[in-house]
C-alpha cells in the first residue's frame, strides 16, 4: 500500500470544487501553476512548463495547457509535452522553469499531480491540504472505533473534522448545481473532436414516463450523466474523488434527495460517510487514473456512493462497509483508456453505470447481516497492487484499449478516404 500519509486525511482533501474535465490534469496542474507563480520573488520574463508522462499523453484533451496559461496570468508560457514515462516518480509529473530575459532558468520546481486536485513534491504534500485528522488508517480500525464508542461513520466525521456541516453544505450545493446545469443544458454536443452527444436531458425526459423500477434506473442514470457531461464541458463540479468520476456520488445523492424526498441533513451525513471511505482509499492506495487506472477513480466513486446509499437506506456500520466493498471489488482491474484523451468515452457512461451499480450494492448489502469474507481494506490493497501491475497503456496514456482502437479506426479512415468512414452514430456513441 501507499505510505505517503500516516493516517486517513480530512474528507475535505477529497472534495474539491473546480472546473473539469480532470482533477489531476486540470485542477491539479492549474493549482500547481498558481503556486509556482506565487513562489517567485518577482514575475519571470517567461515560464517553461514541461509536462511528463500521462500529463503529456492526454493533457491536450484534458485542457491542461489552457488551465496553466490561465493560472500564469498573461506571462509568456512555453509548454513542452514529454510523453516519455521512464523513471518518473509519478506519472503526472510537471516541471516549472522560471526564465529571465535572456531565457536562462532562474528558478525550477518539480511537482506531482497525484489525483483529486492534490499536489506533492519531493518535500511532501503541497498547498492547502489539511493535516491527517483520523487516528486510524483502515476502515476496519475506524469501524471498530465506531462500534466501541457507539458512533455512526458520519458522527465520527462530525467529531473529527473542523466545522464540517457548513463546508459540506457548500460541497452539496455545488454538486446539486452541477446536476441541474447538466439536466438543463440545451447544448447538443460536448466540446472536442468526438462530437459526442449529450444524453442527460433526454434520458431524464424519457425516463419520467416509465414505470418503476425502470423509472428509478433512468433517473439515477440521468443525474450521473448530467454531472459527467458538465465535467466534460469544463463546467464546475466537485471531485468525488476525481473529476473523471464526479458524476457517481452526486447522481446517487440527488436521486435520494429529489426522488425519494430524503431531507438535506440525511444527504449531508451520507456525503460525510462517503468522504470518509474515499479518504481511506486515498490514504492506502490511489485515486489517480494515471497511477492505478480507472478502478482508482470510478471504482472509488462507486464504493463511496454505495456506502452513502447503504446509510441512506438505514444500514448498519457493517452493511455500509459491505456495500462499499462490493462497489470496489467489482471494479478491480478497470482500465483508464480515454479516446483522444478526452474525459468523454468511456468516462461519461462509466459514471452512469457505476451509479447504478452503487445503488444495487447498497440494496444488496441491506439484504445481508453485513458479514462477508473479503474486507473493504483487503479490496483496497488489491486495487493498489492491481494498478501497479497494469501496463502504462491502460493508465491514462491513451495508448491502449478503446483509445488505441479509435486511433487505428481513424488511421484507417484517413487512408481509405471519406467514402469508407464509419457511420456517424459510431463516431458519437462508440463505447
Language-model features: where?
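Non-transmembrane, aqueous-exposed alpha-helical and coiled segments at domain scale
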Residues: 2-7, 12-16, 30-55, 61, ...
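Short alpha-helical scaffolding segments that buttress acidic/His motifs in well-ordered protein cores
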Residues: 14, 18, 220-228, 270-278, ...
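Conserved phosphate/anionic-ligand binding catalytic regions in large, soluble enzymes, centered on
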Residues: 15-33, 233-252, 294-302
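A structural-propensity feature for long, helix-poor, extended segments
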Residues: 46-82, 269-313, 317-323, 329-361
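C-terminal regulatory domains involved in ligand/effector binding and gene-expression control
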Residues: 74-209, 219
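Accessory "access/gating" subregions that flank catalytic or transport cores
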Residues: 166, 176-289, 293, 401-431
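Functionally critical mobile loop/hinge segments
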Residues: 309-431
Amino acid at each position: 500500500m501507499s505510505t505517503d500519509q500516516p493516517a486517513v486525511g480530512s474528507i475535505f482533501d477529497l472534495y474539491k470544487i473546480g472546473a473539469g474535465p480532470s482533477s489531476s490534469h486540470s485542477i491539479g496542474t492549474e493549482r500547481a501553476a498558481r503556486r509556482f507563480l506565487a513562489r517567485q520573488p518577482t514575475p519571470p520574463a517567461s515560464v517553461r512548463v514541461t509536462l511528463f508522462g500521462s500529463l503529456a499523453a492526454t493533457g491536450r484533451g484534458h485542457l491542461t495547457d489552457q488551465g496553466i496559461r490561465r493560472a500564469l496570468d498573461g506571462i509568456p508560457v512555453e509548454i513542452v509535452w514529454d510523453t516519455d514515462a521512464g523513471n518518473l516518480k509519478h506519472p503526472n509529473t510537471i516541471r516549472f522553469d522560471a526564465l529571465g530575459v535572456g531565457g536562462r532558468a532562474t528558478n525550477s520546481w518539480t511537482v506531482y499531480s497525484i489525483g483529486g486536485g492534490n499536489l506533492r513534491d519531493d518535500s511532501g504534500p503541497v498547498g492547502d491540504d489539511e493535516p491527517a485528522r483520523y487516528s486510524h488508517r483502515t476502515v476496519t480500525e475506524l469501524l471498530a472505533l465506531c462500534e466501541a464508542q457507539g458512533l455512526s461513520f458520519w458522527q465520527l466525521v462530525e467529531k473529527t473534522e473542523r466545522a464540517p456541516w457548513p463546508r459540506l453544505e457548500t460541497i452539496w450545493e455545488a454538486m446539486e448545481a452541477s446536476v441541474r446545469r447538466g439536466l438543463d443544458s440545451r447544448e447538443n454536443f460536448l466540446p472536442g473532436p468526438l462530437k459526442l452527444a449529450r444524453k442527460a436531458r433526454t434520458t431524464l425526459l424519457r425516463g419520467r414516463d416509465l414505470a418503476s423500477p425502470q423509472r428509478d434506473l433512468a433517473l439515477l442514470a440521468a443525474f450521473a450523466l448530467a454531472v459527467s457531461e458538465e465535467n466534460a464541458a469544463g463546467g464546475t463540479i466537485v471531485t468525488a474523488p476525481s473529476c473523471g468520476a464526479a458524476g457517481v456520488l452526486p447522481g446517487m445523492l440527488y436521486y435520494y434527495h429529489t426522488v425519494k424526498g430524503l431531507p438535506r441533513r440525511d444527504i449531508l451525513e451520507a456525503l460525510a460517510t462517503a468522504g470518509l471511505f474515499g479518504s481511506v482509499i486515498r490514504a492506502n492506495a490511489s485515486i489517480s487514473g494515471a497511477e492505478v487506472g480507472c478502478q482508482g477513480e470510478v471504482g472509488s466513486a462507486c464504493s463511496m456512493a454505495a456506502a452513502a446509499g447503504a446509510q441512506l437506506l438505514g444500514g448498519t456500520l457493517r452493511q455500509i462497509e459491505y456495500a462499499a466493498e462490493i462497489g470496489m471489488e467489482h471494479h478491480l482491474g478497470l482500465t483508464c483508456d480515454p479516446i483522444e484523451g478526452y474525459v468523454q468515452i468511456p468516462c461519461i457512461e462509466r459514471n452512469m453505470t457505476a451509479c447504478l451499480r452503487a445503488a444495487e450494492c447498497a440494496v444488496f448489502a441491506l439484504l445481508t447481516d453485513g458479514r462477508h469474507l473479503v474486507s473493504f481494506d483487503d479490496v483496497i490493497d488489491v486495487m493498489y497492487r492491481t494498478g501497479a501491475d497494469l501496463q502504462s497503456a491502460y493508465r491514462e496514456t491513451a495508448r491502449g484499449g478503446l483509445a488505441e482502437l479509435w486511433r487505428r479506426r481513424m488511421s484507417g479512415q484517413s487512408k481509405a478516404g471519406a467514402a469508407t468512414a464509419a457511420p456517424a452514430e459510431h463516431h458519437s456513441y462508440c463505447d
